[in-house]
């Protein structure tokens, strides 16, 4: 049998065995087994896996294999988030159908994932573009429509001019489309929405109890939901019929209002623009402005004076009303009472337009003067120049102003949310059709469930931008399900975040055809015990999934309130960037090192090392996982990814770290083969050895079991590996030599081999399965229980005591754990290093802390 560690041969062998024996199939008959649902966010089938995938899925696999060895019934599935714009782009560029492109990519990536030795139940695999999944999703859409959680309305939406589709607010990053990067425009369209705002309070309140989630993610969702308490009231208007309703969280600043501003989409703005070309032109420029907080902060504040005046509800002053590019129609009423002295955006606008600034809050110990302000004062203080509210603390004044407004019938206290209903209409082909029909006689009519699924047409034209379904008359034309007259099919498809909002439930019963879920199976497995994925999904996928889960609960499909009990957000994989003056970014293989300097292989020019950044094709700082696995094996790749950094921190790529992981696995390989060669009885040690060295090492071995178990339970994967490394070094030192062992030495080495392969199995499953088999075991290591520590071996007989002189470390002393304090004191004073430090001095005091230290005070 080959004595050399050959990962390529070993890994293909065990992947085949696991596949043939269906080792990781989810058990159907659970009995009284505890269940554990481990899920890593499924990937978009872009064509190839990258190092971020390798890290992500290695983390998930360690958890799944560990829980399996703990005796739990584990559900560990994989699938594909398969709808989306890239497939349409590929269709246009490469003249290939999105479906063909998608399934070809899935086939490639499936094999790449299998080469990592991941313990997936591949029998539960599905792609969200599969007919059954799309069918089931259409059924859920109709059920939520019946529940009143889906509706259609005209609304200003975020329009991506490159992808020619609508984006939800969460999909606009710094004013640009999350995928295309193009500046987003505002357009008014008829759109389908989910009533996520109906669940705003529950989504917010539940976050307080989700202790298994990172605090950063909970904070991000809290801020995104954006619950605020304020006052809603209306300004009377001069020069325009009706009133101007506003919402403010700062009623304490009411007396400092000097103008009002409205969003470009506000009805007042539209009315003014009808007869004013300059206003219409200004509104058009506003529609290209980003909608994120960051974009609005950086934006140059611009406005257009409408000529309309708002009447202050208390002072009666006339205030100018502006159309402003920094006011969002989607927040509050789309109109703002502007207080330039105490709001930075209003301050910048007032300065630019020469509008009066009134200070109405003075901080303690200071006097602010409007003409001297360089920025708005937004801190606490007492009200000034505020009529009957003058002298009040500003927090107290918020409540008093609200009470005054209600008493006077001017306005009322109200609660507002930053969160807006989720617009799911997308103007593209490669998505799930919305199962609705538009009839001239009947209006909007849902497609009966019996007529589902609505399938996408195969013959489509991608030569023009926009939605091909809109240009497909034979598909678009249908009969009204209600009256039978000619009607038009809905041509918008669903946002792809729809698919990822319930896929985790489908894994519980993936073979149900058009029936969405088997509730008994869902109740058996949900919630997901451990979810793993990137923090970039905090207010996109994770928020939508929480909402959708609650909506499905309310129509009886699920029982639990939250879908994910614990969340681990892994860090990014980063690598140095390299740049050549002539050829730009260089891949690592395009750079050569000579005499300590780097040169471009193509032109010989000097290459500079840039920032350590997230691996990306655009910066060429990527390492191909296939090359890594071909060169070192999947076990080395997995081990490095899990050892190089804590799971929730960024990992900085280091080639020497990969070599180190490879060498460590080689040492373990040789250690276990040595045990096979040298151990006579091949029986594990079950009692405490008489030999002191063996006794000490067995204590280290079993303390390592405790350490690794604790580390895996708290997901400190890198420190668990470090503990096994330290223990294996101790084993090599303890059992050095090549002679055949008998008795307690043989038993302990054999126990060491057994424990080592078990502890390493979640990290390096192929190598450890091979070693387990070579040790003569008949069962799969994947089916073997996790090792348990022997309590007797954990009892420490000796302890290391630190000796300090005047608080400074001077020596160490190993003593029996039950040694009397007087004896420890005597040994400490007799220590040669202590004698040197106390020579010629008087010992004033000796403090003995049992089991820890001795401090000698001398002068």
UniProtKB/Swiss-Prot annotation:
GO biological process: leucyl-tRNA aminoacylation
Gene3D superfamilies the UniProt entry points to: HUPs, Isoleucyl-tRNA Synthetase, Domain 1
Binding site for ATP: 617
InterPro entries the UniProt entry points to: aa-tRNA-synth_I_CS (IPR001412), aa-tRNA-synth_Ia (IPR002300), Leu-tRNA-ligase (IPR002302), Leu_tRNA-synth_edit (IPR025709), M/V/L/I-tRNA-synth_anticd-bd (IPR013155), Methionyl/Leucyl_tRNA_Synth (IPR015413), Rossmann-like_a/b/a_fold (IPR014729), tRNAsynth_Ia_anticodon-bd (IPR009080)
Entry keywords, A to Z: Aminoacyl-tRNA synthetase, ATP-binding, Cytoplasm, Ligase, Nucleotide-binding, Protein biosynthesis
Reaction catalysis annotation: tRNA(Leu) + L-leucine + ATP = L-leucyl-tRNA(Leu) + AMP + diphosphate
Motif 'KMSKS' region: where in chain: 614-618
GO terms, molecular function: aminoacyl-tRNA deacylase activity; ATP binding; leucine-tRNA ligase activity
GO cellular component terms listed in the entry, alphabetical order: cytosol
Domain of life: Bacteria
Record-linked SUPFAM superfamilies: Anticodon-binding domain of a subclass of class I aminoacyl-tRNA synthetases, Nucleotidylyl transferase, ValRS/IleRS/LeuRS editing domain
Signal peptide (UniProt feature, chain positions): none
Motif ('HIGH' region): 43-53
Places the protein is found: Cytoplasm
Record EC number: 6.1.1.4
Protein family membership: Belongs to the class-I aminoacyl-tRNA synthetase family.
HAMAP family with a match to the protein in the record: Leu_tRNA_synth_B
NCBIfam families cross-referenced by the UniProt entry: leuS_bact
Protein name: Leucine--tRNA ligase
This protein's encoding gene: leuS
